[in-house]
């Protein structure tokens, strides 16, 4: 599998794994021991507020039986920049709700999301 295809598959493991609460797909998407999500949520007043959380903790929330995932519609990869054999960046439109950027790393031959930065649209 070419790097671009493997990166795309990893991003969609995250996107679809989140929507279906699929722990296996989520853990395949992230470098779980080091990955973080950082971004701007809109607070109750509609103002952007900076937020950060480790993915190890976030995956636990997402697979909880009580958790209800947001519905995003279709996700779209807007760009992929592979800048070395072990590093890449991806810009992803999360169904028009969020604009995500991913820092990707290649670990043991597999592309993983190391960090995600997002802005609530």
Predicted segment positions?
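Short, low-complexity N-terminal intrinsically disordered segments enriched in polar/charged residues
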Residues: 1-24, 28-32, 44, 48-50
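Surface-exposed, charged secondary-structure patches
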Residues: 6, 35-98
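Functionally constrained cores in energy, signaling, and assembly domains
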Residues: 10, 18, 23, 29, ...
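Ligand-binding grooves and catalytic loops that recognize ribose/phosphate and carbohydrate rings
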Residues: 26, 34, 55, 117-121
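Short beta-strand edge/turn micro-motifs at domain boundaries
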Residues: 89, 99-121
């Amino acid at each position: 599998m070419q790097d671009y295809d493997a990166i795309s598959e990893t991003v969609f493991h995250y996107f679809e794994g989140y929507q279906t609460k699929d722990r296996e797909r989520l853990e395949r998407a992230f470098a779980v021991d080091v990955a973080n999500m950082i971004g701007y949520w809109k607070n109750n007043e509609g103002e952007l507020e900076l937020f950060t959380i480790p993915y190890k903790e976030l995956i636990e929330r997402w697979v909880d039986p009580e958790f209800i995932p947001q519905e995003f519609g279709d996700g779209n990869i807007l760009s992929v920049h592979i800048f070395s054999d072990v590093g890449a960046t991806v810009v992803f439109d999360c169904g028009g709700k969020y604009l995500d950027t991913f820092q990707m790393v290649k670990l043991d031959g597999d592309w993983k999301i190391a960090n995600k930065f997002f802005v609530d649209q």
